[in-house]
A protein has these predicted regions:
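Acidic/polar-rich alpha-helix caps and helix-coil junctions
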Residues: 1-89, 130-297
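Short, cationic low-complexity segments
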Residues: 93-116
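A contiguous, surface-exposed recognition patch within enzymatic or periplasmic domains that forms
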Residues: 106, 113, 121-129, 133
Length: 297
């Protein structure tokens, strides 16, 4: 189907298939040894030229509880906290149970207790520009209050070794809206393919093809405009080709018990490190990071 409406929502349309093909072409160089930038670019341009999708004005609207009308979504996996409840064989979405600590139950007045299994790597958190609003909108950080204003717990930006980590250490994913009174499942539909990905794939294709590199930086700046619009420095959204081609902002390495890097590991420059970082900041907690890490080496 080529239509984008209620009848095709949650189904893989022609545009979803093209986005999937673009993903495969994007990583073809590391999968097969033969880059397929032109093939990826063709699929991206088909989606862009369809005129059926656009960037959502507000980043948070992509991930809110009632997000089925998101103009950015190309393919979403529909979830429902009521109709899918108790059906372990059906599609269920309970990301908050994995990411939140047990103390978060009081923060959101939840009807169940989260498992508290995952937290953000401080090195990744520290790579964000402080004015990038995606840092605020993606991660629960600092003091956490109950609906009536009582301080429940604090999520510090630290994650020392497994032997020294407390249950509330590290920022937690707050990207997907959690309603007060949440159960073990959420009704947020998961945006498996979204228009921003298509734009970033196009930007990445243009760089190695050595054509229209200014166009590539313009596309990335367009995406970043949404992330910096509400900040004190919206001009930071604008980047150039040199920024995209520069090294990553992430300080990789292992952490000691005090949360300090004690082994820097591989310190080689990441080619297109700025673009690599942009993939991470835009799509954190959207189940695609490993694919990008493979592509960037």
């Amino acid at each position: 189907a080529t239509e984008v409406n209620k009848s095709t929502y949650g189904r893989l349309t022609q545009w979803g298939a093209k986005c999937l093909m673009a993903r495969m072409y994007l990583n073809a160089g590391v999968y097969t040894g033969t880059p397929m930038w032109n093939e990826c670019l063709e699929q991206c341009n088909d989606i862009i030229n369809s005129g059926l999708f656009s960037l959502e004005t507000n980043y948070t609207d992509i991930f809110k509880t009632e997000n089925s009308g998101c103009v950015e979504t190309i393919f979403a996996i529909p979830y429902d906290e009521v109709y899918n409840e108790g059906d372990n064989n059906g599609p269920v979405f309970g990301a908050h149970m994995k990411f939140l600590s047990s103390n978060s139950r009081k923060v959101f007045n939840m009807q169940t207790t989260p498992w508290g299994g995952s937290a953000a790597n401080p090195q990744f958190i520290n790579s964000y520009d402080p004015d990038d609003m995606r840092l605020k909108y993606t991660w629960l950080q600092g003091d956490q209050y109950s609906p009536d204003g009582v301080l429940i717990t604090t999520f510090p930006n630290k994650l020392p070794s497994i032997y020294k980590t407390d249950t509330d250490d590290g920022y937690r994913v707050g990207k997907y809206e959690i309603k007060v009174g949440a159960k073990s499942l959420l009704s947020n539909d998961f945006p498996y393919f979204r228009y921003t990905e298509v734009l970033l794939m196009k930007a990445e294709c243009l760089l190695p093809l050595r054509t229209k590199r200014n166009r590539s930086s313009h596309i990335v700046s367009q995406i970043r405009e949404r992330a910096f619009r509400e900040s004190a420095h919206p001009e930071k959204a604008t980047v150039d080709a040199a920024w995209l081609k520069g090294d990553t902002h992430i300080n990789y390495g292992t952490l000691d018990e005090k949360g300090q890097i004690d082994d820097a590991g591989n310190t080689e420059v990441v080619e297109l490190g700025g673009l690599y970082d942009e993939w991470g900041w835009e799509f954190a907690a959207e189940a695609r990071r490993r694919t990008d890490m493979i592509r960037f080496g």
